[in-house]
Structure formats: C-alpha cells, structure tokens
C-alpha cells in the first residue's frame, strides 16, 4: 500500500484534524542540536512546550494518541534545513549517545519512530569537518539498536542529488548500500533542487533510477512536494498536475511507494491530502 506522509511544524492548524485525512504517517518537526550544546536535544516548531529540554505541548500529546487510535503513525524528525554543518560536526563520534537521547524522547511520548532530515551537503562533497556517510550510517545503526523493527520506524528525507550517482554529492547511495535494510523508506525532497523542481519528467526519471539502487526499491521511495508555492523556494506543482503527470504515469507502469508533503498547515481544508490520497488508493480513516 502506498503511503501518504506530511510534516507538521508550525501548529496553525490543529494536529488532530489529521484524523479525518488519509495520511498514513505524520512527522513532527524538528528535534535538533546546536554547536553550543551538541549533546542536548532541542525542539522547535508549534509542537514545543519547551525547547530545551524538549517537551511536547499537551495538545500535541493528545493529538498523537488520537491519531494512533485511528491507525495512523506519528514520527519525530531530527535535523532540518536550519541545522548547521558545525552542529553536526560536534556530534560526530557520539552517535550512540544521540540515538539514546532520541529513543528516550520517542518512548517518552509513545511515538512510532524517527525521521532523519539531513541536509548538510558539504559533508558529502568533502568540504565539511566530518564525513556525512559515516555519520548517517553510524546514527542509523545506533537508532535501530535502540528502536527495533518492526515496532519502530526509521525514515530519512534526502534531497535528490544525494541519490544521483556521480552527482558529486551522492552520499545516500552509499548510505543505502550499507544500512538500507534498517531504513523503512525515504521521503525524497523533490523541491528546492533544480532540475527536479517543478519538472514531472525529471522526477519520474530519477524515481525509477533511484528505485534500482542497492538498498532501495520503489516501495521504499516517497515523492516529496510542497503543498503551496509558498512552502518552497522552487518545486511547486499543482495538485491536478501531480496526479496526471507524476502519480498516474508511475502507477501505470509500476509501484509508487507514496507521496510526502511539506507542510500540513498549508493544506487548509485538506484538499491536497484528500485528492492525492484518493489518487494512490487511500481514504480517510473515519
């Protein structure tokens, strides 16, 4: 079954409204660390009652329970576009401790898993103070030790150049070779990344190529797109075009692992979720 995934960050629309939408998985965003406090998790966004120590709001806690009672999974994402290369470099070598801290947060709030939104391109091009592949492999292994399958999910959210062989930043090709079996799926960000941004033909072509990589399959690949033009610097595609130019062609010839969007609060009224969900065979739980 295809998945429909959304990221929940700013809190302008109540999280519990997702119970009436066909999302299979909701990812809360973001946990992160800083250069100044590399081993102390912090929590951002509208879900945070406290940034440090990281604490969810009571409304979020109640919504998580409602979603899970509905058969929907709720994960927390670590990283995000604002986490710096310097912050990552400070936690290298401490992946086990980081994984333990993340697992403690997940079990404290009865969450279903962790998403890694790693966007430090410099760590794949050799210009960072650490090796991004080694870090992600070590962190994924440590997380899977703390969060065993199938009870817990581990997902990653790479940008497409990270999966394009010989792109000069194809670190995730090796990550998937080494620990793909420990990763449940990838939420690939097909936006803010020319030439994929706004180009269905590029997205479909790369989707097919990525699905053939070691450690990957079409079932483990989700296509991530912005809900509105304001949700990304580039890459917006209208709902109708997503269905007719991306989803339908892929499903006609093969398997679509699912769709992801950034972000939940931009889909006021749920039209994106409902239309895209219907096109991949999903209906609202109730």
Report each predicted region and the residues it spans.
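Functionally critical loop-and-helix segments that line ligand-binding/catalytic clefts
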Residues: 262
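Chitinase-like catalytic core of GlcNAc-active glycosidases
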Residues: 1-244, 250-256, 265-285
């Amino acid at each position: 079954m295809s998945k429909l995934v959304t990221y929940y960050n700013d809190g302008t629309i109540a999280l519990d409204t997702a119970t009436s939408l066909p999302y299979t998985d909701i990812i809360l965003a973001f946990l992160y660390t800083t250069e100044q406090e590399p081993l102390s998790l912090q929590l951002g966004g509208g879900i945070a009652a406290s940034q440090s120590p990281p604490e969810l709001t009571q409304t979020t806690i109640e919504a998580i329970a409602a979603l899970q009672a509905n058969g929907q999974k709720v994960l927390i994402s670590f990283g995000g576009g604002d986490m710096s290369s310097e912050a990552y470099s400070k936690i290298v070598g401490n992946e086990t401790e980081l994984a333990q801290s993340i697992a403690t947060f997940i079990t404290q709030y009865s969450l279903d898993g962790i998403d890694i939104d790693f966007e430090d391109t410099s760590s794949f091009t050799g210009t960072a103070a650490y090796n991004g592949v080694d870090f992600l492999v070590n962190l994924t292994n440590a997380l899977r030790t703390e969060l065993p399958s199938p009870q817990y999910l581990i997902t990653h959210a790479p940008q497409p150049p990270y999966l394009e062989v010989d792109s000069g930043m194809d670190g995730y090709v090796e990550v998937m070779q080494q620990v793909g079996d420990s990763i449940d799926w990838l939420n690939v960000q097909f936006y803010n990344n020319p030439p994929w941004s706004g180009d269905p033909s590029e997205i479909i072509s790369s989707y097919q190529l990525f699905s053939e990589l070691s450690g990957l399959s079409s079932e483990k690949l989700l296509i991530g797109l912005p809900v509105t033009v304001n949700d990304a610097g580039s890459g917006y595609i209208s709902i109708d075009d997503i269905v007719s130019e991306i989803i339908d062609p892929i499903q006609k010839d093969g398997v679509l692992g699912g769709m992801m969007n950034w972000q939940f609060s931009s889909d006021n009224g749920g039209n994106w979720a409902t239309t895209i969900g219907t096109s991949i065979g999903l209906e609202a739980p109730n």
